[in-house]
């Protein structure tokens, strides 16, 4: 796979860049020795992706022994499918349109509902940046509720629910019946801290998914205006997911680069993407991203609302924010971060903090509350926000605007006061059948991480928790993907459903593509460690396959089975670049004479030989007795 090339960062080049989008920017990639395959659901249009990693044979004295392919969860969309036709200017196939039409509870609007959306659609200055395929938005019919939570509570299993059940199961129910997978599927018992983790893959059914959604313990972020989406689920009783952030700023990054960065994030395994753009052309950037995104897209609408006021928080109004919500909902945003828990009375609680309010959205709303000495309009208009959300099936990501920005401020009065308010708002959203997840910290020392999960489960009624790390120490700028990855693995084990990645540039600057890659791989690792710890069925399959390949010196399979095959191979080749080294029974760490695994294999061979000799002697002894035990015949 080719690393995407850098693009110019000047708006004057945007038209040329967009014209070249589908040409040669590295949007198609090939994973080594693997392919994207599809599992068939109960109907022809439910085709669920996974990736199968093929392995080489193991060669022994007895001959070749086949190693079975290893299925892994895949987020790459069409970009990881060599057979797919990709044209970013056309967008992705609309795989959900038939499902939406069949339900009969939505209508196609004659035009956009948002004043700002209409204005941008007719602005000649942005015509060259506009996505080519303008479609009319879809909205719930009057009096209808179109959320996955509403359907689940009605006892309805939607195609989206069946899709995610198959996707989470990864056909492990089928593989568990095959003898060649018996050893590979062995795993340690997990500790789930009271979660309802399935104990066997065959328990991961569409009905199980429906029950978890109906209980509010899981969400399927799936805006009805995002028909390109390959549905996924976020919940404590499913695989831990990760989110990758992108977005332009007033300082750097272009529209084209954000589209590339989105595809790049999918290549490394992001389950969702948040577009946090704060610079120019936010509306156009988001449209290009959504139309080409097979994963859920989240935003923080207050960022764009603030841009519309020229950056003056005091000038924000409910009407402006409401129009922004509708604008983004009609584009297809799947979840909104809404900082409705930052209440006026909580702001003074942060005065004695070491780092005060560090959330951008939280600080915007705190400033508005203080400037007007009025309650947060996101809180006072929350029911109206719910009405918008349920008309498009946009999920809430209730923002932690008062999250701690350093470990000194962790778990303080203001943080938990806001969390308890988020629980109140969760209950209110559920009365509208709107899906909800809860955002969490932040910066928390390791010994206080579990308390955050306990508080969230208790006060937010087991709604999915979505945390930024947390970072467990503040002494490592440049390495905060590691400081946060430690906290992420732990809180994922305790029950967090989705982890928001942190890159090495955290606190220092806007991440580039390599930072995104490092952040995502770090968080895929943390999420996987959490799945192992909580006992997710089949979580250890990939570990066992890689360990077997390592013991048998199948170097290429080690690379293929790793989270970052390119990096694993490049590190190996730094010291042993010759092609023959990839079949050698040693590495540069110990060399050929001191390799512990090679010595272990020799010990095993010796033991097998001794066993064979003993068995032969025993057989001869039995034969001797049968023949009368005579020394001379």
From Swiss-Prot:
GO molecular function: 4 iron, 4 sulfur cluster binding; carbon-carbon lyase activity; zinc ion binding
Keyword Metal-binding listed: yes
Domain of life: Bacteria
Family matches, as Gene3D superfamilies: 6.10.250.620, Radical SAM ThiC family, central domain
Residues binding substrate, per UniProt: 245, 274, 303, 339, 359-361, 400-403, 439, 466
Cofactor binding mode and count: Binds 1 [4Fe-4S] cluster per subunit. The cluster is coordinated with 3 cysteines and an exchangeable S-adenosyl-L-methionine.
GO biological process: thiamine biosynthetic process; thiamine diphosphate biosynthetic process
EC number(s) given by UniProt: 4.1.99.17
Organism of this sequence: Neisseria meningitidis serogroup A / serotype 4A (strain DSM 15465 / Z2491)
Cited Pfam families: ThiC-associated (PF13667), ThiC_Rad_SAM (PF01964)
Annotated protein name in UniProt: Phosphomethylpyrimidine synthase
Keywords: 4Fe-4S, Iron, Iron-sulfur, Lyase, Metal-binding, S-adenosyl-L-methionine, Thiamine biosynthesis, Zinc
Residues annotated as binding [4Fe-4S] cluster: 587, 590, 595
Cofactor(s) essential for the protein: [4Fe-4S] cluster
Keyword 4Fe-4S: yes
Residue numbers binding Zn(2+): 443, 507
The organism's taxonomic lineage, starting at the top: Bacteria, Pseudomonadati, Pseudomonadota, Betaproteobacteria, Neisseriales
């Amino acid at each position: 796979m080719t690393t995407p090339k850098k693009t110019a960062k000047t708006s004057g080049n945007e038209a040329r860049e967009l014209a070249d989008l589908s040409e040669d920017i590295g949007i198609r990639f090939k994973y080594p020795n693997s392919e994207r395959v599809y599992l068939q659901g109960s109907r022809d249009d439910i085709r669920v992706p996974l990736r199968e990693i093929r392995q080489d044979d193991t060669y022994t004295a007895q001959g070749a022994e086949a190693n079975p392919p290893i299925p892994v969860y895949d987020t790459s969309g069409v970009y990881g499918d060599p057979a797919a036709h990709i044209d970013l200017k056309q967008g992705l196939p609309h795989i959900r349109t038939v499902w939406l039409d069949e339900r009969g509870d939505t209508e196609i609007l004659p035009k956009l509902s948002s004043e700002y959306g209409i204005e941008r659609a007719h602005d000649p200055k942005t015509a060259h940046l506009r996505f080519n395929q303008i479609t009319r938005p879809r909205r719930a019919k009057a009096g209808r509720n179109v959320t996955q939570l509403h359907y689940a509570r009605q006892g309805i299993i939607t195609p989206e629910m069946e899709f995610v059940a198959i996707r989470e199961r990864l056909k492990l129910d089928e593989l568990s019946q095959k003898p060649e997978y018996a050893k590979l599927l062995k795993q340690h018992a997990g500790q789930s801290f009271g979660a309802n983790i399935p104990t066997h893959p065959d328990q991961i059914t569409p009905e199980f998914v429906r029950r978890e959604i109906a209980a509010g313990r899981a969400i399927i972020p799936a805006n009805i205006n995002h028909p390109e989406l390959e549905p996924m689920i976020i919940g404590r009783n499913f695989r831990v997911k990760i989110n990758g952030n992108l977005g332009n700023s007033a300082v750097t990054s272009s529209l084209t680069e954000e589209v590339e960065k989105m595809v790049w994030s999918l290549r490394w395994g992001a389950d969702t993407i948040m577009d946090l753009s704060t610079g120019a052309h936010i509306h156009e950037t988001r449209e290009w991203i959504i139309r080409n995104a097979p994963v859920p897209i989240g935003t923080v609408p207050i960022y764009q609302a603030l841009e519309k006021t020229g950056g003056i928080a005091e000038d924000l109004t409910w009407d402006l924010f409401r129009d922004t919500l509708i604008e983004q909902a009609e584009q297809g945003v799947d979840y909104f971060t809404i900082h409705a828990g930052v209440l006026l009375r909580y702001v003074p609680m942060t005065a004695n903090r070491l780092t005060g309010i560090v959330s951008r959205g939280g600080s915007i709303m705190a400033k508005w509350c203080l400037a007007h000495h009025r309650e947060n309009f996101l809180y006072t208009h929350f029911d109206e926000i719910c009405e918008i959300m349920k008309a498009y099936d946009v999920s809430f990501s209730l923002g932690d605007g008062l999250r701690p920005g350093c470990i000194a401020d962790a778990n303080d009065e203001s943080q938990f006061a806001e969390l308890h308010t988020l629980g109140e708002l969760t209950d209110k959203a559920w009365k509208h059948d709107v899906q909800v997840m809860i955002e969490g910290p932040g910066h928390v020392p390791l010994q206080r991480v579990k308390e955050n999960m306990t508080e969230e489960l208790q006060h937010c009624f087991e709604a999915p928790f979505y945390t930024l790390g947390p970072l467990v120490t503040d002494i490592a700028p440049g390495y905060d993907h590691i400081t946060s990855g430690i906290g992420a693995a732990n809180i994922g084990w305790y029950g967090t459903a989705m982890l928001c990645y942190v890159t090495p540039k955290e606190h220092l600057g806007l991440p580039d593509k390599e930072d995104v890659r490092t952040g995502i791989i770090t968080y895929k690792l943390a999420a996987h460690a959490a799945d192992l710890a909580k006992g997710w069925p089949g979580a250890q399959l990939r570990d066992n396959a890689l360990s077997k390949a390592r013991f048998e010196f199948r170097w290429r399979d080690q690379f293929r089975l790793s989270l970052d095959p390119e990096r694993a191979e490049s590190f190996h080749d730094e010291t042993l670049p010759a092609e023959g080294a990839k079949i050698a029974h040693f590495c540069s760490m110990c060399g050929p004479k001191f390799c512990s695994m090679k010595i272990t294999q020799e010990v095993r061979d010796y033991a097998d030989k001794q066993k064979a000799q003993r068995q032969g002697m025993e057989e001869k002894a039995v034969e001797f007795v049968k023949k009368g035990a005579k020394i001379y015949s």
